[in-house]
Amino acid sequence: MHSNGFFLKDVAGFLGGYYTFIAIMNGVAALILWRRKNQPGWAMVWSIVAGLTMVLAGLALSGSASLVPSLPLSVRMLVNKLSGPVLYTLGTTALFTVLFVFRKFFVKPMVAWTVLNVLLVLMGFSMADENFASIVMKPDNVPIVGLVFMLAFFTWVATSQAVVNDERIAQGLPPMEKLNDEKVLVWPDLVYTELICMVAVSAFLLVWAIVLQAPLEEPASSVKTPNPSKAPWYFLGLQEMLVYFDPWYAGVVLPSMVVFGLMAMPYLDFNKKGNGYYSIEERKFSYLVYQFGFFELWITLIILGTFLRGPNWNFFGPFEYWTPYKVEVLNNVDLPQMFWVNLLDRPLPRAPQGAGMLTQVGTILLREAPGLVLLGAYLVLLPPLLAVTVFRKFFAKMGFVRYMIMANLMLLMLTLPLKMILRWTLNLKYIVSIPEFSLNF
């Protein structure tokens, strides 16, 4: 590690350019609001913000520890202390809920622009910390930072259009897509647009490859493994799931169920509304399930694995140094042990020495009875119970087969957050543990 002074001098040029970019971005926004939108008040606000960020750029270019804008040490230490998988997951879930409930507020352009500026400035302040910058500015991780902002942008675009359409439909008006349904010729309109995009993206990738130094790593060696040893970014969600499940389930069953669910979705859908245009009110259940599965159970796991999982796959705060000597005490137990040993104060059932196959299988079934009963109730009894309560209308419209497929796919999806909660609250490792056949759940 460098000393903080040397680090700030190294990163000063980048931070100066970063704040200058924010200033130009707000200056352009102020010009558009003044000339085209006739909103001089907001134009003045963003002009002031542009001026303030130029001041931040000048301070950052100084490279001085006393002048470079940064978060106070007490704030960084508090963030590190509060950081953890539990708070991270609960926080992202709460954020997802707030954004959904108050979506009509957050889709307003000025609100979204304000949130973007706050996030960009906070990131600039955070990058004055060497530990944070070493993770975020790593060439392999830069695309993930872009992924976060691009996902936020496109989600905002889709949600804002859905809010407008929902308001129009409530007023008895057609959605916006119906007002502009003029067909466009593939040649030359579409092809020219795609050609321009192809050239622009190719030029961007060329500059990216030149500026970001990310050469191929040295050949793999069995005597020298990287720590942390991470999968490619698109598999980090699977690697995070391996913390809570065996490979056969986290790496095979769950991904297969995702693919199967996506293929089955058109055949399970009975709602004829919301096709061909953005809408949330007409497809609220589908929207919530998909967004929760995509963002909460996939994207947030990728972000967690990229930025917050360090050596030995331990969890580190965003401003914490990644030391390989960090030790976390784990005291995970299986459900059979909790039931037989902790609850009944009896040893785990064991087959007698030299017992036959049937006796061994019977003993295993007896030992794992609590977990098997629990899983059976979850996957077999819960769907019919939901059919006569929460999903009564769904069952009436979908029929038995389609409803059971939908219900079981949803329950399998929920096994991930449920298992995570059980690990955090009860230190539960496996609900069913059959090491004799390498079968654990």
Question: Where do the PLM segments sit?
Answer:
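Extended, regular secondary-structure scaffolds
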Residues: 144-147, 169-180
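Hydrophobic cores of alpha-helical transmembrane segments in multi-pass integral membrane proteins
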Residues: 13-69, 80-130, 142-165, 188-275, ...
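Soluble extramembrane regions of membrane proteins in the secretory/endomembrane system
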Residues: 2-7, 73-78, 133-139, 168-173
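Short membrane-interface loop/juxtamembrane segments of multi-pass integral membrane proteins
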Residues: 178-183, 235-237
